[in-house]
Amino acid sequence: MQETYNKQTDKTGDMIFEIELKGDIETVWNLIATTKGFEQWFPEISVGEPGVNGLILFDFGDGQYEESTITAYEPPTLLQYDWDKNTVRFELTDQGDTTILTFTESIVHLTTHTPRDIAGWHMCLQRIQGILESREVSFTEDEFLALFDKYQALLFEK
C-alpha cells in the first residue's frame, strides 16, 4: 500500500492511500459501497440511502448514529462522503482481475482525533485486502497505537 500526505496548510491536506486489490471492480465496489460489504470490514457503518445526497450511517453502539452525506456516487468507480468535517473518497480503477483503490481523506479540519481516523482507515484498507485474498487480518492495540503515532507525527509535523 502506498501512502502520501499532501499538506496544504498547518490544518489542511489530503491523506492518500493507494492499494491494488485482488478482485474485479464490481466485487470491490460491493465491499466499499453496500451495507453488506461494510459489515465485513467496518461493521459500524451502513448505507442508509445510496446516491448523491444519500446517507452513510455510523453506529456508535449506544443507539446513537452519526449521519454522513454522500457527496459523490458513481457506481462502480466513485464513492465520497462527509466524515465529520472532512471528506473521504474511494476511487476504483478497473485492472481486469485486480482493482486499484485510491482512498483519500481530505482534511479541512485537523484535530487531535484525525490521526486516529487515519490509522483506522489504514487498518480498514488492509482488512479489505485480506477479505479479497481470503485471509484474516487483525490488529493488536499496540499495532494501532504505532499507526496512530506515525500519523500524528506526519500530520502535525511543522
Predicted regions: what they are:
Residues I19, S68-A72, V88-D94:
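Hydrophobic/aromatic beta-strand elements that line small-molecule binding cavities or substrate pockets
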Residues L132-K158:
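Short, highly charged C-terminal tails/helix-capping segments
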